[in-house]
Curated annotation (Swiss-Prot):
Domain of life of the source: Bacteria
InterPro entries in alphabetical order: Ribosomal_uS11 (IPR001971), Ribosomal_uS11_bac-type (IPR019981), Ribosomal_uS11_CS (IPR018102), Ribosomal_uS11_sf (IPR036967)
HAMAP family in alphabetical order: Ribosomal_uS11
GO cellular component: ribonucleoprotein complex; ribosome
Subunit structure: Part of the 30S ribosomal subunit. Interacts with proteins S7 and S18. Binds to IF-3.
Function according to Swiss-Prot or TrEMBL: Located on the platform of the 30S subunit, it bridges several disparate RNA helices of the 16S rRNA. Forms part of the Shine-Dalgarno cleft in the 70S ribosome.
GO molecular function: rRNA binding; structural constituent of ribosome
Gene3D superfamilies membership: Ribosomal protein S11
Keywords of this entry: Ribonucleoprotein, Ribosomal protein, RNA-binding, rRNA-binding
Keyword rRNA-binding annotated: yes
Presence of keyword Iron: no
Protein name, UniProt field: Small ribosomal subunit protein uS11
């Protein structure tokens, strides 16, 4: 019987990126932190739901802090040293996510608010009656 042919596989080389972009999407229900390179290719991401928080605890500043820390530690493997932070959304985890990325050890070059603001676009949802 013939021996099975062994395939030679090359180890995937991780590219080294020195500066990246951290996209923080802070909604009222969740916070998503994505770290990309300058071209927009994702290096790592984390959400407050994926960090183990469920329900109303997902929308807390502490959950955003944990998610940003998780995404930041994963991006350290690529050699990222400095970050530009782009914040989108009105959620409660905006500032704590940026503070957490700073505590991980990144040099934050600038912080940009890219929240989309309509110039009288779509009709907003009806007001809540509690």
């Amino acid at each position: 019987m013939a021996k099975p042919v062994e395939k030679k596989t090359k180890k995937k080389i991780k590219r080294v990126i020195t500066d990246g972009v951290a996209h923080v999407h802070a909604s009222f229900n969740n916070t998503i932190v994505t770290i990309t390179d300058r071209q927009g290719n994702a290096l790592s991401w984390a959400t407050s739901g994926g960090a183990g928080f469920r329900g109303s605890r997902k929308s807390t500043p502490f959950a955003a802090q944990v998610a940003a820390e998780k995404a930041g530690r994963a991006a350290l493997d690529y050699g990222v040293k400095s970050l530009e932070v782009r914040i989108k959304g009105p959620g409660p985890g905006r500032e704590s996510a940026v503070r957490s990325l700073n505590n991980v050890g990144y040099k934050i070059t600038n912080i940009i608010d890219v929240t989309p603001i309509p110039h009288n676009g779509c009709r907003p949802p009806k007001k809540r009656r509690v």
